[in-house]
Structure formats: C-alpha cells, structure tokens
Curated annotation (Swiss-Prot):
Chain residue ranges for the region called Disordered: 6-27
Keyword list, A-Z: 4Fe-4S, Iron, Iron-sulfur, Metal-binding, Methyltransferase, rRNA processing, S-adenosyl-L-methionine, Transferase
Name of the molecule in the record: 23S rRNA (uracil(1939)-C(5))-methyltransferase RlmD
UniProt source species: Alteromonas naphthalenivorans
Gene name for this UniProt entry: rlmD
Gene Ontology MF term list: 4 iron, 4 sulfur cluster binding; iron ion binding; RNA binding; rRNA (uridine-C5-)-methyltransferase activity
Amino acid sequence: MAIFYKPSKGKNKSNVKGRVRGAGSGEKQHIVKTKQSWPSVDDINAANEAVTIDGMDWQGQGVARGDTLYFVDGALPGETVEIKALSSNKQIVNAKVTKVNTPSEHRQKPFCGVANQCGGCQLQHVEPQEALALRDDALKSMFQRKLGFNEGAWQAPVSGNRPRYRRKARLAIDARNPDKIKLGFRENAGKNIVDIEGCPVLVESLSQLIAPLKSAITGYASARLVGHVSLLAGENAVQVTVKHTRSLANDFIASLSQFAVEQNVNMTIEDGNGEFTHLHEIAPITCNTVDGFYLQPGPNDFVQVNAEVNTKMVAQALSWLAPKAGERIADWFSGLGNFTLPIANSGATVSAVEGVAEMVQRAKSNALEQGITNVDWMQLDLADEKSVDKALAGGFDKVLLDPSREGALTVCHALVRATPNTIVYVSCNPNTFSRDARVLIDGGYQMQKAGVVEMFPFTHHMETMALFTRQQQ
C-alpha cells in the first residue's frame, strides 16, 4: 500500500492534525501524521495514492491491510486501485474505487446498465461464484476468530440460480413532476431514485411490470401521494401493492385497476393507516415452502426474496434439526410458518412464536387449511425477558431461531437457562449472529455445523445457519 504515516519526532504532545506534505504541485504528495492524530478524509484524497487489495470481507468490500486498514467498495483481491475516502476513524478508512489500475481476472462488466448508480446491487463487478467463495471464506475466518469453532464444522454454501432470483421488491417513486415519473430503486449512498424500465435480478414476471406500471401512474396528480410500490411473485399470481399517504383520486384508482386487469395481477392499495383496499384479485398469493406446504402472505408480510434458496435453506435446517414425533420443538420468530409447517409434519409438537399478531393469525389459519393441528401459535415480544422465560418454562427438546437483523440476544440468554438439547439458528446478520452465538457457547453449547446461505446474490447481505448442541456436563 502506498499511503504511509510518519510519527512526529518532536516533544510537543498537543493534538496536532495530520497534514499533506509535498515539495511542489508536480511532485507526489505524502500524508505526514503527527503522534496523536490520523489523516482526515481530505488528507487521504489529496494524497491520491493507490492501494493494493489483499482480501475481501463478508460484505464484498475489498480489504487492504497495512498501517491503515482500508475497506474499499468496488475493489477485488489482487487489484491495485485508486480510491476516494468516504470516512476515516483512526486506523480504519472506508472508501470507494475511482479507478482500477490492475484489474482482477475475476472482475466482470456489470450485466445491468445502471449497476453503478443503483443501490439495489453492489457486487455485479465480480464473477458470482468467486464472490460467493471469497465471502464464504471471509465469514468462516470471522467466525473462527470470534467463536473458535472447529474448521471441519464449516459446511458448503447454499446457493441457487442467478441472476433472476428476486421474487419480491419495493420500488421507490419520484412523482414531483407527474408527467415525468421516476420509478425504481434508490441510488447507491444517496436519496435520488434511479429510474428503470426493468430489473435483471427480478424474476421476469415482476421485471416486465415496471414499464407498464410507470405508464399507468404517469400524468396523474395522485401519483404525488404514492410512497412506494411493492411487488411479490407467488406460485399462482403476482401481487402489486401501492402505498399512499392521502386519499387517491378516482381517475388514478381506475388507472391502477385497468393496469391490474391488463397485466392479470392482484392490485391492492394501502392507506396511511395501514388499511387495504383490493382493487383486483386473480387469486390469494401462495408461496411454497417444503414437503408440499405453502404460505399465504398478506401484502406486507415477510417472505424470503429468493424462492429457490429458501427451499434449500428450509430443507437444510430440517436436516440439522432432525425433528421427530413426540419431541417438543420451539420455532421462534416463526413468521408465516416457513419452518413451522414442515417441522410439524414430522409429528413433533411445535410452539410457533412470532412478534406480529396479524402474521400469527394468518399462519394459524393457513396451517389449519393444510391439516396441521399440532402447533401452538403465539404472539410474543421476544425481546421481553420475562415473557420469553415464561414461554420456555414447559421445556423443549429442540429450538429453531430465525430472527430479523437485530438478532435474538434475549432469547439466547433464556435458552442457556432453559437448556434444550439442540438449537438451529438462521441469521440474516452475521454480526448479531456472532454476538448471540458467543452467548450460547459461553452457556454450554458447541457449534457443530455452520455455513453460508446466499439468499441475496450481488448484494452486501449474507445469511448464515448454525447448529448448536448442548455439551454433556
């Protein structure tokens, strides 16, 4: 790495800011650091020196190590790149690539024309298999460093087909000029909307709706009242939900209805109070899980965006959990029953706990419709220690956790006290997972298996799954 620092040799210990030194405008500048300060973003950018990337973190950022640790968006291992520093905190600099001097053999041209502006994807510049391999290795190294598990416990990653993997999306809208509407995703590190006609990572049934939907809402004053548009492709139909802040004019509603009829999709509008009006419905949306079961999400319910990888993920979780008839199993953060239904199909008695009351009722109704009666569905605040301890008081043989990005810290502390034999933890945030896993390990559990689930190709996000078993005392 070319950027370097020189400590001050003087005895003055005052906090003097770092500065850039150069003999003249034609000479290369170098950052000079005094003893108690680090160069500012402006200092780093003024130096305009290249860095060599020697690794990748689990989010897909290039890493350059030296006196300073650089995390560089858009850079790949082995590359020498010029950068723009975005933030600097002591020995850590966050930056983005401005020029690639020596490209990696794994660098590719993004397959989307707006990939460099759109905030939807961050990793189209690297071959997808290489991105998965590098990030898989980065996560394994991070977990080994923080959790100290046996390397042989690391499992092959779960992945699926690319690039059209997303069955769900939320489109932002800029209708300040109703005659020139922008419909798309927010730009990378900004608030502006990148206008699109289609999206190459959406399933085709969603991507092909974007252009006609924009036409349907262009020219209407009510378009200014739309906050966002949600799309969901089910097994049997497509759901379009338009979120609005105030009452929509009749002509705008009529245009949405006509669009739904012409495109043969479900159309729902949602007002500022969360009330839904169904303008057109082909059929209630269904999303398959495993063993022939399906979910029936409402317009705002959570479902995994990647249908193929979700099926593989559920199958692996079931294999690791190994539910059996007669066992008592807790499926917490259960949502609509993505894991619950196939677990219950084993004959085990299941406690399904979810924080959103509407999803609990929908999940229960859907389960009964499919003949599943051995589940106790419960709405519970899983961040409340007393409620969690009370719900665990009956005792469970096994537990499956699938929390949101905030993790399951309260639940993990409670599980250490409740001592179930087996825990399968599915996480969408490796940082909160490693925090929670440390609680379990310190509380007497051993991480037997762990691995990556590539739910979101081409993005910074990564899911993980781990199996914990209670150590014999």
